[in-house]
């Protein structure tokens, strides 16, 4: 069964780092660069689009959280992320803070 990008877009939610931390422990977190849309990446994973996923991985637009990122996020456990679950993965994207 193929899940559409539009359908996945309705499933994107906001979640804090403290809640996501457990998914890091089991290895399910995948960081998505802000240049990509979570729903687009989720649809590619769900469709097993190996070419797109490999392209994003090789260009650094998609990957596991780095140790530096985890340390930074552990300091601010309330940090907000956009999140999309595409089992077994939890796709996350840092929310940018708007100055105001």
Predicted regions and their residues:
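N-terminal, charge-rich interaction modules
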Residues: 1-47
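Generic secondary-structure microfeatures
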Residues: 34-36, 57-61, 88-90
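Short, hydrophobic/π-rich interface segment
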Residues: 40-73
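Short, compact, well-ordered microdomains
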Residues: 64-100
């Amino acid at each position: 069964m193929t899940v559409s990008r539009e359908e996945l877009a309705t499933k994107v939610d906001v979640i804090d780092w403290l809640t996501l931390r457990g998914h890091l422990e089991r290895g399910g977190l995948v960081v998505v660069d802000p240049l990509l849309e979570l729903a687009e990446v989720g649809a590619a994973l769900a469709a097993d689009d190996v070419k797109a996923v490999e392209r994003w991985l090789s260009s650094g637009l998609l990957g596991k959280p780095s140790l530096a990122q985890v340390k930074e996020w552990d300091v601010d456990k309330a940090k907000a992320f956009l999140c999309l679950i595409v089992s077994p993965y939890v796709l996350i994207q840092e929310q940018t803070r708007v100055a105001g």
